[in-house]
Amino acid sequence: MYGSCPATCSLNPDGANSAIEIDQDYLSALRKAVPKKGQAWTYSHFDYATIPQNEEKHTTINYSADTVIQALNSFNSGRETTYTAPHTMTDKVDDIQGVRFVRCPAEENKKITCQNCGSGQPLCARQKRDYIVKFTAHGANKKKVGQEEKGGCYAGPGFTVFSWKATAKQKQEVSDAVKLSEWIKTLPYGSMIRHHVAGDIGLDK
């Protein structure tokens, strides 16, 4: 199930069956997969240094950090960054070494979704932002986040896992890169897309 996720991700409980390199064809397609006049964003646990810098009119790929140090290093290198924080780190804004960690607004307000976040410009879709977006750990495995034991991925348990497994079992005649490139063309003007509710950009074994 975690085949496209990096084996090094601390939230990944199945590193032995996970990716050790990026699917470059898929990454190229993903960066271009933006609806016309729309917005697209996603997250990756792969080392930010192995992913091209974000560009205008391309998908915003956020480096998803597992530790504060990772988050600060990524942010200070000019990367759009998110941080998966322990479930106890619930403040709206944290200031760490002069950098703001802004909690996802949807975690505090049930009326906010990705679609209406930031008045139509979702925080995670914004490039060249001066803050890190913080996601407080949630789900059945939330207490594992920030601990030495690997695990804590929110998509592992609950309803998300059913869709994830079903998607993984689907048979297709073309690569994910081709399928994504064709699918994005079918979306209406101005659509917003959050790629990868689960999974990553790794080359599946």
Regions found by a protein language model. Name each.
Residues M1-K205:
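Class I S-adenosyl-L-methionine
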